[in-house]
């Protein structure tokens, strides 16, 4: 079992994320990723997600192994306004895999130019051990 999405009977299916995920296997925990050098929120999101995919590949995993993404965003108004571009950046990097997610508005991040930081947790089946 790679993972199982938790979808209680009678709950509406959330758009673009899962309320919960059950998984077993080798854990991959990634530090927060930012969009180094990218201009604007959606571009920084695209770069941060590409960084996450690169790190997953380094571990022998892929986007399909993601269990959770925690997004820290400095401008929630821009987040809401740019949903189409953010969705496109997400689909380009991750595809149609939707792990558990939280989006948290913050006043600032450690890097002054960073508009978003994304942390990731993934689990690979034990057969992916190297």
Please give the residue ranges for each predicted region.
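Short, polar/acidic, helix-capping and beta-turn segments at strand->helix junctions
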Residues: 2-130
